[in-house]
Amino acid sequence: MSSASPLRVLSIAHTAVSRAAGRLRYHPLAKRADLDVHLVAPTRWHQFGRTSEADPPDDPGITMHALPVWFQHARPVSWYLHVYPTLRRIMREVKPDVVHLWEEPWSLVALQACLLKGDAPLVLEVDQNILKRLPPPFEAIRKFVLRRTDHILARSPDAAAVVRAKGYRGRISYIGYGVDEATFRPAAQPQPTAKRPLQLGYVGRLVADKGLDDALDAMARAHSAVRLAIMGEGPYEPALRERATQLGLVDRVSFQGWGTPAEVARFIQNLDALILLTRATPTTLEQFGRVIVEAQSCGVPVIGAATGAIPSVIGAGGWVVPERDPRALAQLLDTIAPDSEARRLRGAAGRKNVAARFTYEAIAKDLADAWLEARASAADRHQDAPYRSLSQPSPHR
């Protein structure tokens, strides 16, 4: 690559099957003359019981390659078992200067990319934040991939600690999930606060680990009038409905299914605070909490549990309560229910948090910085190699 040529990057991400979920963060990169970005995503993806067709390309500045995948129905581990049978052809056509993977290092597609990338440096984006030994062959794949990775983009300090513990010694920087500010923005008309119950909301899967039981218990303990609106689907919904009935909260808790991004934004705009009370378990730990930044982008503060990445993502834009502690949550609800000014200030702080860390422009810059750094470091190593070899004694002497 000459100094005048743009850096050719091949980014591989199954999430990019969806424009809203995975592609918008790449859009700011199309304006950069120093980058030539090629994005690989599946033509079709199966996740959480749903099959999604790849959205059509919508940004002429990014070259989209929608490729068929194998093993996409190997749930619940399809994220780690899928491969692209035509990836070798794309590698030969693009001849990338840098390969970027938005996949975990033990995935088969990470192994595939390592075997096909040639001398191109590898940038790897990781979410996994629980240190554990993986079953064969995944532990061996992780070790193989990390040894050949030039730069890690970690979602959280816990995720960085995991790759360090597994032997990675290279450069690490941090990257969040971006938020679509055009969709997730403050309501045009602020919600009236006088004589209105405190309106809490939750968006996500309905499973026991999300801690919604703690929210219901806290509502029953609190002296203030509190309502909870739940948007999402999952196997734990019947148990939540039963618990709400047992606590006498049926008329204060509402359920609705998944919505489009625009519907999620309108749902959040009607809240006084969003809750994310995820519980840590031996197998799960909140890796980021994208709904946190969606709420903050709407100017809505967040109440989160002190677990996983939740506190670091919330920042000053909300409150953090102890995990699995309905009493502490009830006390917080009684404190903020009558204090609309405190909620407004935390909401404003959340907007600043998003502007500084989680806009798509910020995420795109984090990506570009990592790609350019990896390429520069690789070039330095190649330039230094002849001098290192001359300085080392010959094994035949």
Residue ranges and their predicted role:
Residues 1-68, 120, 396-397:
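N-terminal subdomain of nucleotide-sugar transferases
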Residues 15-18, 104-108, 120-138, 148-151:
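A short, histidine- and acid-enriched strand-loop-helix "catalytic/donor-clamping" loop
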Residues 284, 292-297, 301-304:
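Short hydrophobic beta-strand element within catalytic cores of glycosyltransferases
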Residues 241-262, 273:
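Nucleotide-activated donor-binding/catalytic signature segment of Leloir-type glycosyltransferases, i.e.
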Residues 41, 131, 139-187, 195, ...:
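Donor nucleotide-sugar binding/catalytic pocket of nucleotide-sugar-dependent glycosyltransferases
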Residues 269-285, 300:
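Acidic donor-binding loop of glycosyltransferase active sites
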Residues 10, 192-221, 229:
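Conserved donor-binding/catalytic core segment of Leloir-type glycosyltransferases
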Residues 113, 316-327, 335-341:
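Conserved acidic donor-binding segment of nucleotide-sugar-dependent glycosyltransferases
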